């Protein structure tokens, strides 16, 4: 009788059209409508792109009209939600520039760490846009641009509600990359989920040494929340790959390789135990797994007194 709800990140069109593909799941573990979520969705990324590039335009316009702030080095780049190699390095009239993908924009990270529009406005104003000849930090609010930026983002700041194929509600909002940002969905979406569901499930991009630590040390601190449980997802294929098995042989039963690869799982478990939160290892089962391979993981978890579940 308990109500679960998911709170997830939005896909970026760059990976969707690249090697990684979409970010709505697969099989029966999927949020829908897949094509709408992966492509444009509600336009949140476009609003963030527009705000990002408005700030860039204001910087260059300020320099053009006399540079009263004495900007010597610009430290804020343009963005676009497409993998466009030709725009990674471009030449402007008086300096070089580059485009980041929108998910890597500082505005995307701030968008997801703000708990209100006022909070977002303050953080936008504190973006470091450059340095003067004395290496003084120059902030966006010195251009008096933060009001315009937050106005562009006011509608995008509302979270988006969709559902899984099994009709579980899913709030999808924001999408900072985890390698250069904190890799978590927005705080406002997470708090909305907490107000509506009995169990709120979210994801933190990448493993315990990156996604989990950023979620716990950055997002949770900013939002004044903390998880009741951590789920560490493992697969037999990944464990064998960590043991050095080639992709060509990874679907062949290899119990010894699973045992050898468990050292990687052990390292992630060790990282997460430091937070003192109940931990569950979830073995994401595939039909290519064998019962003997799965049993290696189950037995190891029991030996280490770690709760384990097999997802089918």
Language model: regions and residue ranges:
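Flexible phosphate-sensing "switch/lid" loops adjacent to ATP/NTP-binding sites
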Residues: 1-312
